[in-house]
Amino acid sequence: MHKKPTVLGAQNALQVLSTVVQETPLQYNKRLSDALSASIFLKREDQQQVRSFKIRGAFNKINALDPKELEKGIVCASAGNHAQGFAFSCNQLKTAGHCQLSPL
């Protein structure tokens, strides 16, 4: 069962992630703005070290695990972007990780 998000949890995640996640810009997109008659900005998460926002969830979760949970290593299954965030997080946190990539 998942825990309901809290303000304190978000504040803790912000503090933890500030050590590994880069602040990325919003970029105005004229073509989409014109097509949709609205001001459209794209959040450039492709500028993260792993080229995706997936680092946020992977790092925050692995960092929150108890050291006993990490002793045997951790496992994930992914089709791509999450695997990059997972591998980066395991490396940064010096934790053994095994990732099963799904075939395309």
Question: Which positions does each model-derived feature cover?
Answer:
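PLP-dependent amino-acid enzyme catalytic core
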Residues: 1-104
